[in-house]
């Protein structure tokens, strides 16, 4: 069963140093914040230096056929979003559909940032879109 809130993030602009994403958030439990038109009015600007490379583990494994195979695992690293915001490398402009905030920042935007950094570490490329639905 769903709690009825979430958000979506879409990449708009990318240059050599930064990426600008726009996001929308919604809360189906409150008529004022439903955002039925899915208007992307919040922005998240991320400096590319914020994207941390994952820790890579390589291991030789013996396969059932008897051959050995190199297995590569990408282990995501923790990202300090609050430190990035303090240094100005991560800038969040809240959506008009913000109903819950943490220190003046939309909670959905923070969840989307976490998913954004995690997707980068898993795939190795800057995500074009990500979403968070609870």
Regions found by a protein language model. Give the residues of each.
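Short N-terminal edge-element motif at the start of the domain
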Residues: 1-29, 37
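Acidic, low-complexity intrinsically disordered segments
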Residues: 50-134
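A short, surface-exposed beta-strand/turn
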Residues: 30-63
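Short linear sequence elements within intrinsically disordered, low-complexity coil regions
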Residues: 10, 26-28, 45, 122-125, ...
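A structural detector for beta-sheet-dominated domains
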Residues: 10-12, 24, 45-49, 73, ...
């Amino acid at each position: 069963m769903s709690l009825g809130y979430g958000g979506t993030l879409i990449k708009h602009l990318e240059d050599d140093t930064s990426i600008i994403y726009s996001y929308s958030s919604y809360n189906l439990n409150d008529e004022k914040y439903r955002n039925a038109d899915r208007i992307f009015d919040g922005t998240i600007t991320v400096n590319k230096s914020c994207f941390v490379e994952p820790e890579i583990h390589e291991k030789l494994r013996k396969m059932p056929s008897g051959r050995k195979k190199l297995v590569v695992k990408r282990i995501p690293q923790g990202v300090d979003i609050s430190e990035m915001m303090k240094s100005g490398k991560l800038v969040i402009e809240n959506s008009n559909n913000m109903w819950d905030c943490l220190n003046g920042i939309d909670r959905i935007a923070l969840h989307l940032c976490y998913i954004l950094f995690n997707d980068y570490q898993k795939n190795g490329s800057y995500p074009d879109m990500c979403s968070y639905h609870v």
